[in-house]
């Protein structure tokens, strides 16, 4: 099952590389609609799959719906006049998105326990259909100037990759998210093996830290326009670094507990809620004409890096491990954000 998740994330990263520039060519709306249609069809196929092999193959197709996550950010950038305004709106969008990882593990665990694994996919199908209907009637086209060809749009990748500020903001977003991906990769092991949390309760413990992410995005939504993207990213990474440092210190001195571990991740989530939307908005503001391409490339790097860190977390946590290796990995990931954003500020002067 872990293999299916890794495969899903890999396909998701590739999809975003393609669909980002494609959205700058054909527009945002068509890709969102067809991505949701494919998501619903592939979900039905997964429900009626007859073997593990079929499940693994079909599991990758819902990854195309990651397009909606990327394009929602591009749509926000299309409809705003500045990076600060985009950061504020992206924060509110992400705040709503954070509800899913907060309640998803607990709901999925209970559906699986009481009904069976297909119940999770039936729930996803109903949600997918509902979002498809809403998007069909409510999402308009926001792309102002479309590209002439897909090859022309792909050709903007080298320009973005040569931009030092793009890389600085991209690394900021990827490493901040990477700390959370590391947590997702290692938290089930730490919760069950280190702290002895029962499987029925584990989903709740793992999902609770998303509360911090919700509040962090709320703060970004309220203050990004007043303070600016760079200052918000600096404040966010400082808060995240404080949270993971406190938990790491307690664990090193033998004072770690489930409350200190999962509680610290709430603080990390609070900081990430300020870091990720503002670094993403700044990344897309480097050249607004290729906002979709920048969003796709940045998100692909973020997901790819996050999947790698999640795999590292699984690798370093072996039977008999404490929570310390995971906290060290999270600390390193968060710390890298600091020099990256400072460099972005320096290059922007």
Provide a role label for each language-model segment.
Residues 9-17, 67, 101-102, 210-214, ...:
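Residue-level signature of mid-helix packing/kink "hotspots" within the transmembrane helices
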Residues 13-52:
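Conserved MFS/SLC helix-loop-helix module at the cytosolic interface between two early adjacent transmembrane helices
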Residues 38, 42-45, 53-61, 259-265:
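Paired small-residue
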Residues 52, 58-99:
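Cytoplasmic helix-loop-helix junction between adjacent transmembrane helices
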Residues 54, 91-137:
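Helix-loop-helix hairpin linking two adjacent transmembrane segments in secondary transporters
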Residues 140-170:
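Juxtamembrane intracellular "pre-TM" segments in multi-pass secondary transporters
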Residues 280-320:
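A late C-terminal transmembrane helix in Major Facilitator Superfamily
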């Amino acid at each position: 099952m872990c293999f299916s998740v890794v495969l899903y994330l890999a396909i998701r990263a590739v999809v975003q590389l393609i669909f980002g520039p494609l959205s700058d060519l054909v527009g945002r709306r068509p890709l969102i609609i067809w991505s949701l249609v494919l998501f619903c069809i592939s979900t039905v196929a997964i429900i009626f799959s007859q073997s593990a092999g079929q499940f693994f193959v079909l599991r990758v197709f819902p990854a195309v719906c990651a397009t909606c996550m990327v394009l929602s950010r591009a749509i926000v950038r299309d409809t705003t006049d500045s990076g600060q305004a985009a950061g504020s709106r992206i924060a509110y969008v992400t705040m709503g998105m954070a509800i899913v990882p907060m309640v998803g593990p607990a709901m999925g665990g209970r559906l699986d326990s009481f009904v069976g694994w297909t119940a999770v996919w039936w729930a996803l199908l109903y949600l997918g259909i509902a979002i498809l209907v809403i998007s069909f009637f409510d999402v308009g086209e926001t792309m102002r100037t479309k590209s002439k060809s897909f090859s022309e749009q792909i050709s903007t990748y080298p320009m973005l990759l040569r931009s030092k500020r793009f890389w600085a903001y991209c690394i900021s977003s990827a490493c901040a998210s990477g700390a959370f991906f590391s947590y997702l990769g290692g938290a089930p092991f730490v919760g069950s093996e280190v702290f002895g949390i029962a499987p029925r309760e584990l989903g709740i413990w793992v999902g609770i830290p998303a509360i911090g992410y919700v509040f962090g995005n709320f703060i970004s939504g309220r203050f990004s326009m007043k303070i600016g993207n760079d200052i918000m990213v600096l404040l966010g990474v400082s808060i995240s670094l404080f949270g993971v440092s406190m938990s790491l210190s307690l664990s090193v001195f033998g004072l770690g507990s489930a409350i200190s571990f999962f509680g610290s991740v709430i603080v990390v989530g609070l900081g990430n809620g300020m870091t990720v939307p503002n670094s993403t908005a700044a990344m897309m503001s480097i050249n607004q004409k290729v906002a979709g391409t920048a969003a796709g490339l940045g998100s692909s790097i973020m997901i790819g890096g996050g999947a790698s860190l999640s795999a590292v977390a699984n690798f370093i946590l072996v039977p008999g491990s404490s929570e310390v290796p995971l906290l060290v990995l999270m600390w390193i990931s968060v710390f890298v954000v600091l020099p990256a954003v400072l460099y972005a500020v320096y290059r922007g002067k």
